Amino acid sequence: MKNIFQTSDFNLVATLHSLNHKFNEIKREDNNKVIFCFTKNTHLSVAIRKYQQGELCIEPQKFAYSQKFLKTIIYNNR
């Protein structure tokens, strides 16, 4: 699993989705926590670092669409 980045941070996932990063898998834990899995690459690592440092700008409508899209996936695949 070295080449897989996993996160349950919904806003990070929405940000990455807004930047056209595709997740490979969604895992559900026993406590209903959802974990998104991405293939690691340089572009993903840069986006995550910039997100953590508050250096990203995302178009608001694209971010809102990503949130809605992800919530639909989460709640329709229970």
Identify the residue ranges that each predicted region occupies.
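Generic alpha-helical propensity signal that fires on short helical segments
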Residues: 22-25, 39-41, 52-56
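Acidic, low-complexity, intrinsically disordered interaction modules
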Residues: 28-49
